[in-house]
């Protein structure tokens, strides 16, 4: 039996609360059509108080698995009977699948972050030092990716220092916590600068100047944002003006979807320019560029 026959009729999902904004159905729908797989992928809105029962009934509802987004990633971590290494390190699950009747959980955010940089800025992981702006949930996946790829020194800057200290303590050696007032001084020797903050996102000071001068960064440094709405944030615009290589966050969204699709439908999809343009067209239609 070939992969397409095995995947025939398989169902997968993305769940969150709210979920109508998700572009995951567009991504997976594109791949299902491109690969000629007779499967489906749908958005399912689940309230936080209903998540446990939803996760327990995946098989009964005919799902092979699915993606999990805000606010359910920690609940999915707790619900999974088996976790992959990334989920254990990050403490959150964004991908669920069934294996021999067991609910398994993984986290593909770190993979997506690194794969996006591999595609758009090859050699980024030669940087000895990285600067991560922000210490929220998303920064955990970024730090895990950086450590996994051998970055020697990761500085995490956050307005609330205790959040950065908590993250540094979680990952241990090679991760250092700093207050926001130290960010400027850390730019000068950072080979990679990652913005995980909401600064510059839609509804979070969009259009305002980014509050850090990036002109003193090493000329070979790479600057990347993990958000993709808007595509070109104030941070990326400022980095570009400073002459740095910039990588937007859309590729992370696309690449993090790859492992889950392969688990549910049996074929590994490719992140292509055609897929990127498909999502950009939808963003343009929604006024999200």
Swiss-Prot record:
Pfam families hit by this protein: SDH_C, Shikimate_DH, Shikimate_dh_N
Q: Give start-end ranges for the coiled-coil region(s).
A: none
Its domain of life?
Answer: Bacteria
Give the residue spans that cross the bilayer: none
Its Gene Ontology biological processes? amino acid biosynthetic process; aromatic amino acid family biosynthetic process; chorismate biosynthetic process; shikimate metabolic process
- EC number(s) for this protein? 1.1.1.25
For molecular function, the Gene Ontology terms on record are: NADP binding; shikimate 3-dehydrogenase (NADP+) activity
Extract the CDD domains matched here: NAD_bind_Shikimate_DH (cd01065)
Q: Does the keyword Oxidoreductase apply?
A: yes
Name the positions where NADP(+) binds.
85, 134-138, 158-163, 226, 249
Q: Reaction catalysed by this chain?
A: shikimate + NADP(+) = 3-dehydroshikimate + NADPH + H(+)
Similarity-based family: Belongs to the shikimate dehydrogenase family.
Identify the PANTHER family for this entry: BIFUNCTIONAL 3-DEHYDROQUINATE DEHYDRATASE_SHIKIMATE DEHYDROGENASE, CHLOROPLASTIC (PTHR21089:SF1), SHIKIMATE DEHYDROGENASE (PTHR21089)
Q: Which HAMAP family match?
A: Shikimate_DH_AroE
Q: How does it assemble?
A: Homodimer.
Task: Provide the protein name.
Answer: Shikimate dehydrogenase (NADP(+))
What is the originating organism of this protein?
Answer: Brucella suis biovar 1 (strain 1330)
Its gene name is aroE
């Amino acid at each position: 039996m070939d992969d397409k026959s095995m995947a025939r009729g398989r169902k997968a999902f993305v769940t969150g609360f709210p979920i109508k904004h998700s572009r995951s159905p567009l991504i997976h729908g594109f791949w299902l059509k491109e690969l000629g797989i007779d499967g489906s992928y749908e958005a399912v809105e689940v309230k936080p108080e209903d998540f446990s029962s939803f996760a327990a009934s995946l098989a009964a509802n005919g799902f092979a698995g699915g993606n999990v987004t805000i606010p359910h990633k920690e609940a999915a971590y707790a619900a999974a009977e088996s976790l992959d290494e990334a989920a254990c390190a990050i403490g959150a699950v964004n991908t669920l699948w069934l294996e021999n009747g067991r609910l398994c959980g993984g986290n593909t955010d770190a993979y997506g972050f690194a794969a996006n940089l591999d595609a758009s800025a090859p050699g980024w992981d030669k940087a000895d030092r990285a600067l991560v702006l922000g210490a929220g949930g998303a920064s955990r996946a970024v730090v895990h990716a950086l450590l996994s790829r051998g970055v020697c020194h990761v500085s995490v800057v956050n307005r609330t220092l205790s959040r950065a200290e908590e993250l540094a303590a979680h990952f241990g050696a090679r991760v250092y916590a700093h207050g926001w007032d130290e960010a400027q001084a850390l730019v000068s020797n950072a080979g990679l600068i990652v913005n995980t903050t909401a600064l510059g996102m839609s509804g979070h000071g969009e259009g305002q100047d980014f509050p850090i001068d990036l002109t003193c960064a090493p000329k070979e440094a790479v600057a990347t944002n993990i958000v993709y709405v808007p595509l070109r944030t104030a941070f990326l615009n400022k980095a570009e003006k400073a002459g740095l290589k910039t990588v937007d966050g859309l590729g992370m969204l696309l690449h993090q979807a790859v492992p889950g699709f392969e688990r549910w439908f049996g074929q590994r999809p490719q992140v292509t320019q055609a897929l990127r343009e498909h999502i950009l067209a939808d963003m343009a239609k929604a006024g999200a560029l």
